[in-house]
């Protein structure tokens, strides 16, 4: 790997230098060929294994943990920071630079009495979801590899330590700006320094002045709205949408007790530590705006409040428009050129009525959408009908759908288009759990198979049909904990 060290050299007050502590008996558990290409790597090697496991120095790396704060479950925590993630620097690749971080690399000054380690199950889950979201077309950080060990760590019970090698276009979070506004009062110069660095690194077309700052914040609002529209369309619940888990680039970031929907539930809670459902699936759009408001609050020393509010007011429109684009594609509805607000509302109601039907009939979210690839939209009889219990209610919806759909002249092409946007394979929690159990038993084959299938989520892959099925009873609606 070839590194540059812009964050390390230009923002010395934004991190603490800390070196990883190696794990014992390191070994590869998973490797992403796709992610490796981003930083010009080929195959995993012994030299790379030693370096990324913290057992040897990586040439050109500057090891550091970033400091930030954040709102966690609605309350402000004044000092967080990378408690178990150590960044090596920005690795250069054919299409730009990517931060390389060792998640689980050992304790840092921000560990808050933690051991700085990640357990194997959480490392595997982060690897799989990073791959899954990327291949579904959802903006996300990437995972290069998972490195296992025989090092014991204790959570609810004894587990083994592992490291996820994460790649990110940036590790700058909403919480970085909050820290230098709230926790380090009177440090407007640091906010400006961080803003200028962010613009030069990631928005070089914007000027480092008030006009550039305003344009940047509007872009963050729009990118966040688009990200959450993706989550709602694909059926993904993040689970811990704290402001310190929000990327300023609009990438999915910092995965914990996430879940893809099995049976559709509008307010599905995937996090055992969220009994009130603050971060439930259906709450994500509102939380996205709430988090942006906290970011805006942190930026008031450098951007006038009226300009911040004007940008925040664009959030709902950006969210709805991107969500409509994604959902119209799933349903096969033509995009309306210069659609009116009334037409958009009609489409939202049509989509909403269908998801309500899904929930009432306890249908699998992804599998139901996939069935549109078998639908003959020109037929008055829908092959979907047999999936529903309330047939009259479905018939009323389907008639309205056909009216909105209009005439389809090439049914086969229409069906293929549906299969290109409605995935057959998603990362169901029970599949991840089965792969983790197999890894614990020394069998990597299920993990490797699941990983390869998730790289082509829209392909039929008939030899892997079992991975597209609804979960067994024990795997329905699995709720994970924040313990990792």
UniProtKB/Swiss-Prot annotation:
Organism: Shewanella sp. (strain ANA-3)
Catalysis: reaction(s): L-seryl-[protein] + ATP = 3-O-(5'-adenylyl)-L-seryl-[protein] + diphosphate; L-threonyl-[protein] + ATP = 3-O-(5'-adenylyl)-L-threonyl-[protein] + diphosphate; L-tyrosyl-[protein] + ATP = O-(5'-adenylyl)-L-tyrosyl-[protein] + diphosphate; L-histidyl-[protein] + UTP = N(tele)-(5'-uridylyl)-L-histidyl-[protein] + diphosphate
Keyword tags: ATP-binding, Magnesium, Manganese, Metal-binding, Nucleotide-binding, Nucleotidyltransferase, Transferase
Reported cofactor(s): Mg(2+); Mn(2+)
InterPro entries the UniProt entry points to: SelO (IPR003846)
NCBIfam families per UniProt: PRK00029.1
PANTHER family with a match to the protein in the record: PROTEIN ADENYLYLTRANSFERASE SELO, MITOCHONDRIAL
Positions with a binding annotation for Mg(2+): 245, 254
Protein's UniProt name: Protein nucleotidyltransferase YdiU
Positions contributing to ATP binding: 81, 83-84, 103, 115-116, 166, 173, 254
EC number, as in UniProt: 2.7.7.-, 2.7.7.108
Membership in a protein family: Belongs to the SELO family.
